[in-house]
């Protein structure tokens, strides 16, 4: 045993033997004991010798040797197991190797990049030309960024200006619209007021016209009567002026009992009898005042008055009297001639 175990490992070996001889771990699984001894740094050969020390019989030694061989081959089984064996390790295929290779490559690439970027520049500084080139490239990038930012700022300023102009135009339009609505409302109210005033004036004018027409119906009839009387009087005056004294005497002594022309009353007498003399005088005064201002009389009224004047009717009995010669008997003519000196 002294040949197998060296002097520097003698203490470790003796502790392993004393561990195996302990009664508290006597019933422990053999594999657990072997794993524990391996964890302490003993070799397989030293473990085998240590296992033989507590038990000098050959059965235990053969059993220990078999267990050690099963650990190396990972295929043999223990003949004296006190509990179930742990499951065997799964068999590795190409996927496991691929994953391991990928992970290894990633780690190696990461280490390479770290070394290239940080370790090597600190150990071996780069040349000034390369540093200047990198600096220039960085400056170019910053210049591009500044240009883009300036363009964006200009676009934003123009957009804000357009928006402000649009808002101003919209505000002006709204103000104009409000003013137009106010003016429209005022105009509508003014038109409504004027319409009411015109309506009232039209109603008043209509009432005035109706009243005037109703008042002038009797006046028109009176004017017609007055004109007929004036025409009768003028005709009689004409007859009287054109006749001679002989005719006047003949008419006055007519044996037929027909009254003479002198017995016919004048228009003033007739009106006095009818109680209308004052009204006729007023109408004459009104007619004289109207003649002073002919321009104030409408054309239709002038035409109507002319028609009435031109068509002044003369009674038929007057026309017949004027047209027919008054027949005087011969004996009356003789008497008249004898009476004339």
Swiss-Prot record:
UniProt KW Acetylation keyword: yes
Give the GO cellular component terms, alphabetically. Answer: peroxisomal importomer complex; peroxisomal membrane; transmembrane transporter complex
Question: What keywords is this UniProt entry annotated with?
Answer: Acetylation, Membrane, Peroxisome, Phosphoprotein, Protein transport, Translocation, Transport
Query: What Pfam family is a match, any one?
Result: Pex14_N
In its UniProt record, which GO terms are filed under biological process? Answer: protein import into peroxisome matrix, docking
Phosphoserine: modified positions: 313
- Give the gene that encodes this protein: PEX14
- Here the segments flagged for biased composition (Basic and acidic residues) are 279-295
Indicate where the modification N-acetylserine is found in the sequence. 2
Annotated Gene Ontology MF terms?
A: protein transmembrane transporter activity; protein-macromolecule adaptor activity; signaling receptor binding
Q: What is this protein called?
A: Peroxisomal membrane protein PEX14
In its miscellaneous comment, the UniProt entry states: Present with 2570 molecules/cell in log phase SD medium.
* Motif range (SH3-binding): 86-94
Q: Which InterPro entries match?
A: PEX14 (IPR025655), Pex14_N (IPR006785), WH-like_DNA-bd_sf (IPR036388)
**Quaternary state and interactors:** Interacts with PEX13 (via SH3 domain); forming the PEX13-PEX14 docking complex. Interacts with PEX5 (via WxxxF/Y motifs). Interacts with PEX7. Interacts with PEX9.
Q: Which residues form each disulfide bond in the chain?
A: none
Is this entry keyworded Zinc?
Answer: no
């Amino acid at each position: 045993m002294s040949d197998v175990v060296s002097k520097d490992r003698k203490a470790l070996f003796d502790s392993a033997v004393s561990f195996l001889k302990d009664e508290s771990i006597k019933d422990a699984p053999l594999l657990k004991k072997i794993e524990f001894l391996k964890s302490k740094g003993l070799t397989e050969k030293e473990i085998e010798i240590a296992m033989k020390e507590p038990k000098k019989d050959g059965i235990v030694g053969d059993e220990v040797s078999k267990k050690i061989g099963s650990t190396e081959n990972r295929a043999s089984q223990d003949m004296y197991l006190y509990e179930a064996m742990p499951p065997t390790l799964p068999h590795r295929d190409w996927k496991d190797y691929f994953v391991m290779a990928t992970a290894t490559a990633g780690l190696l690439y990461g280490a390479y990049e770290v070394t290239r970027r940080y370790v090597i520049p600190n150990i071996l500084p780069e040349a000034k030309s390369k540093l200047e080139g990198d600096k220039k490239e960085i400056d170019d990038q910053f210049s591009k960024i500044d240009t883009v930012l300036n363009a964006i700022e200009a676009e934003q300023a123009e957009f804000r200006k357009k928006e402000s102009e649009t808002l101003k135009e919209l505000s002006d339009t709204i103000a104009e619209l409000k003013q137009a609505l106010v003016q429209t409302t005022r105009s509508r109210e003014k038109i409504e007021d004027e319409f009411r005033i015109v309506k009232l004036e039209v109603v008043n004018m209509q009432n005035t016209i109706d009243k005037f027409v109703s008042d002038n119906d009797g006046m028109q009839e009176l004017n017609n009567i007055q004109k007929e009387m004036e025409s009768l009087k003028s005709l009689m005056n004409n007859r009287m002026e054109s006749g001679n004294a002989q005719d006047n005497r003949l008419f006055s002594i007519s044996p037929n009992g027909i009254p003479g022309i002198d017995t016919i009353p004048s228009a003033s007498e007739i009106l006095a009898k009818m109680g209308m003399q004052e009204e006729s005088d007023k109408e004459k005064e009104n007619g004289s005042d109207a003649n002073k201002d002919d321009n104030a009389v409408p054309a239709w009224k002038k035409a109507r008055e002319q028609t009435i004047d031109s068509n002044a009717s003369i009674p038929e009995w007057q026309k017949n009297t004027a047209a027919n010669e008054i027949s005087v008997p011969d004996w009356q003519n003789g008497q008249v001639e004898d009476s004339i000196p």
